[in-house]
A protein has these predicted regions:
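Glycine/serine-rich anion-binding loops at beta->alpha junctions
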Residues: 98-117
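Short glycine-/acidic-enriched loop or helix-start segments at secondary-structure transitions
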Residues: 54-56, 111-113, 137
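A glycine/threonine-rich phosphate-anchoring loop and its flanking beta-alpha core
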Residues: 114-160
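Short, basic, helix/turn surface patches
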Residues: 96-103, 152-158
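ATP/NTP phosphate-donor binding region
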Residues: 1-99
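Hydrophobic aliphatic residue packing
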Residues: 15, 24, 107-108, 140, ...
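Glycine-rich nucleotide phosphate-binding loop and flanking beta-alpha elements
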Residues: 51-52, 107-109, 134
Length: 160
């Protein structure tokens, strides 16, 4: 179960990207066992359903600089919604030396990666994927895409 064990690094590997190499770490267990500094200095973007299900377990992250709770559906993964997310982060004093921490599946990963690649001309991000597809697609592949108008996944980035 996601929130029951410690969070050891069980394996890692390097990816060679056209934007430069980066390391992928695989971890299992309790995401709240991440180092406290990372949790409390990050602006967290989390899937609403995940937060609803594990509300008690996620209490420690409620004191992060900002917590942006998003319902993981296609309408929220759109260019029209980006100003809402950017305004939230700016209002909560996002700085270039801080990072975005995404907790959720592919939609949350896409939103967070797209924001991280574009806000303040690019900031650091960290993913905690909760689905296998999100792990392989947006996390290891470091790609994100959002919808614009009637076009699905038309705007995107590769952000190692």
């Amino acid at each position: 179960m996601l929130l029951t064990e410690d969070l050891p690094v069980s394996n890692c590997f390097d990816v060679q990207s056209h934007k430069g190499p980066y390391r992928v770490h695989f971890m299992t267990g309790n995401i709240l066992a991440m180092d406290e500094e990372t949790l409390l200095s990050s602006h967290i973007i989390i899937d609403k359903k995940l937060l609803d299900i594990y509300e008690q377990q996620f209490k420690p992250i409620l004191s992060a600089p900002s917590l942006l709770v998003i319902e993981a559906d296609e309408k929220n993964k759109s260019l029209d919604k980006m100003p809402v997310y950017v305004n939230h982060l700016v209002k909560n004093k996002l700085r270039r030396n801080q990072k975005l921490l995404a907790i959720g599946g592919g939609i949350i990963q896409d939103i967070t990666c797209f924001l991280a690649a574009n806000i303040l001309r690019g900031i650091e991000w960290q993913f905690v994927p909760t689905t296998l597809l999100a792990q392989a697609d947006s996390c290891i592949g470091s790609k994100s895409s959002i919808n614009c108008g009637d076009s699905k996944n038309i705007l995107g980035t590769f952000t190692p």
